[in-house]
Amino acid sequence: MLNKLQRYLSDVNINSNFVHGNNRLLEFSTNSLNFLAEYNPDSDPTYFRIMLPRIQSEDLQLDKEALDRIMVINSTYKVGKIIRIGKSLWMSAEFFINPTENNMLVFPRAISLLTDMYNDYFSPSHE
């Protein structure tokens, strides 16, 4: 699955690299955002996840307003979620797909979904 994603990214002139030689994590940047894609066929060959890691960290203050904003975004984008990992917020979109089918449309949709979520989260109307 990540090889298919890498081919798609190459076709649209986006560089990508496997993280630390690990063939289960692929990193790439587009629209000034750093993405991380995960696929582990040994664990579940139908599960594919793409993330925006550490969108907000260290000085993370999850007050009521921030939590409300997260809840609105999580309910608006059904397959996308904002989660807290340690002292950071991550955005994640998860899909169950058949790895033997042509899944090329999933990739631009996932990237667009996370980009939209990111823009909504950091929109001036929410600050």
Per-range role (PLM):
Residues N119-E127:
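Flexible helix-coil linker/hinge segments at domain or subdomain boundaries
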Residues R49-S88, S92:
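Short, internal acidic amphipathic alpha-helical interface segments
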Residues V79, R84-R109, F122-S123:
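Well-ordered alpha/beta subsegment
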Residues T30-E58:
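Long, continuous compositionally biased terminal/linker segments
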